[in-house]
C-alpha cells in the first residue's frame, strides 16, 4: 500500500531506552513494521538478541499490549509475548515500549509451517488443532478482564470508521453486482452490533526456540465480532501450502468447536471470511488501483457464500477449487 513505512523510525528513543536497561548494547537495527517502531538489539557480551517494540504517536497498540498480554497469559492464553521489560520498568520514560527475547520472525515461521506439511503431516495436523484450541481460548476471554482491551463501543467505532470508505468505493463501482451490495449491507449491520467475542489478532506468528508459535500483531485487541478470531486463524492454515486442507480444517474445528460446527458458528464464520475477501477488494480500490479487476474477488466470495465446507473455502483460496 502506498505510504507504508514512510515515517522516520524513532531510533534515538530506542537507543535511549535500551541503554537505560542494558550496559552492553552493541547495535540497534530498525525492523519495518506497521503499528510501531520495532528494533533488533544486539549486545557486545554475546547475549541473545532482544526485540524492542516502541509505540508511535497516535497509535496505542504498544500501550495496549503492555497492559493486556500479561493478563491474557495469566488467563490461559500463553501464546502471546512474554515481556522482559516494559515502559513500567522505566517510570521516567516518555515512551510506551516492551522488550522481548528475539524469536523466529514471521517469514521463517511461515516457512516452518510449509516444511511441516511437507515433512511431518501428523505434526502439522496437531498444530492446526492447537490453532483451533488457542482460538477458542482467545474468543472466550472477557474484554472487561483484560486491561486496556478495546471496549465493544470502541470496536464498533474503529470498524465502522475503517471499513466505510473501502466499502463505499466498492459499491460505487458500476460493475458491482447486486448481491455484493446486499452483502455489504449485511456486513455494515454486523459491525454495528455489540461484539460478543474477543479477538483482534492480525494473523502474524513468531516461532519460539522450542518450536511453539506465538501470536503477534494485535491491531484491534479487545471485544470482537463472533468468529472473527476464528476466521483469521483459519486463513493462517493456508501457510501450510496443502493442496487439500481438509485434514487441517477438520483438526482446527475440532480444537475450536469440540462439540462440532453448528449453524450459528458456520454463518458467523462465513460472513467474516467473505467480509475479508470483499473488504480487501475495497481496500485495493482505496490504496492501489481504483480500476482494479475485481472479478476474481467476486468469484471467490460468491463461491464461498454458497459453500458450507470451510475446507472448500481454503482450497479455492489456495488455487485448488
Tell what function each PLM region has:
Residues 50-96, 116-130:
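A conserved alpha-helical element in kinase catalytic cores
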Residues 265, 282-321:
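Helical subdomain adjoining the active site within ATP-dependent kinase catalytic cores
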Residues 227-261, 274-292, 300:
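Active-site activation/catalytic loop segments of kinase-like enzymes and analogous catalytic loops
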Residues 69, 98-107:
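Short pocket-lining segment of the protein kinase catalytic domain that shapes the ATP-binding cleft
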Residues 1-28:
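Juxta-kinase regulatory segment immediately upstream of eukaryotic protein kinase catalytic domains
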Residues 136-137, 147-190:
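Active-site catalytic-loop/activation-segment of kinase and kinase-like phosphoryl-transfer enzymes
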Residues 34-47, 184-228:
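Active-site acidic catalytic loop and adjacent metal/ATP-binding pocket
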Residues 109-148:
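Conserved kinase catalytic-core helix
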Amino acid at each position: 500500500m502506498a505510504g507504508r513505512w514512510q515515517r522516520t523510525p524513532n531510533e534515538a528513543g530506542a537507543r535511549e531506552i535500551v541503554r537505560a536497561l542494558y550496559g552492553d548494547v552493541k547495535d540497534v537495527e530498525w525492523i519495518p513494521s506497521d503499528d510501531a517502531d520495532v528494533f533488533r538489539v544486539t549486545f557486545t557480551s554475546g547475549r541473545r538478541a532482544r526485540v524492542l517494540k516502541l509505540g508511535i504517536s497516535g497509535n496505542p497498540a504498544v500501550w495496549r499490549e503492555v497492559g493486556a498480554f500479561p493478563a491474557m497469559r495469566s488467563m490461559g492464553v500463553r501464546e502471546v509475548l512474554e515481556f522482559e521489560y516494559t515502559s513500567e520498568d522505566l517510570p521516567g520514560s516518555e515512551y510506551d515500549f516492551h522488550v522481548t527475547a528475539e524469536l523466529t520472525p514471521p517469514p521463517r515461521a511461515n516457512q516452518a509451517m510449509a516444511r511441516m506439511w511437507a515433512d511431518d503431516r501428523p505434526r502439522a495436523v496437531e498444530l492446526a488443532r492447537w490453532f483451533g484450541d488457542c482460538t477458542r481460548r482467545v474468543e472466550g476471554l472477557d474484554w472487561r478482564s483484560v486491561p486496556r482491551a478495546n471496549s465493544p463501543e470502541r470496536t464498533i467505532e474503529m470498524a465502522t470508521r475503517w471499513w466505510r470508505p473501502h466499502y463505499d468505493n466498492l459499491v460505487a463501482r458500476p460493475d458491482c453486482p447486486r448481491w455484493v451490495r446486499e452483502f455489504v449491507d449485511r456486513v455494515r449491520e454486523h459491525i454495528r452490533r455489540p461484539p460478543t467475542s474477543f479477538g483482534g489478532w492480525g494473523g502474524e506468528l513468531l516461532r519460539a526456540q522450542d518450536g511453539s508459535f506465538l501470536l503477534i500483531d494485535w491491531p484491534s485487541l479487545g471485544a470482537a465480532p463472533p468468529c472473527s478470531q476464528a476466521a483469521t486463524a483459519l486463513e493462517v492454515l493456508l501457510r501450510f501450502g496443502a493442496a487439500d486442507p481438509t485434514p487441517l480444517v477438520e483438526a482446527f474445528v475440532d480444537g475450536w468447536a469440540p462439540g462440532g460446527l453448528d449453524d450459528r458458528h458456520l454463518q458467523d464464520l462465513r460472513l467474516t471470511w467473505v467480509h475479508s475477501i470483499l473488504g480487501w477488494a475495497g481496500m485495493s480500490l482505496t490504496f492501489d488501483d481504483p480500476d482494479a479487476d475485481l472479478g476474481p474477488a467476486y468469484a471467490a466470495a460468491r463461491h464461498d457464500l454458497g459453500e458450507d465446507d470451510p475446507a472448500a473455502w481454503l482450497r479455492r483460496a489456495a488455487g485448488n477449487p
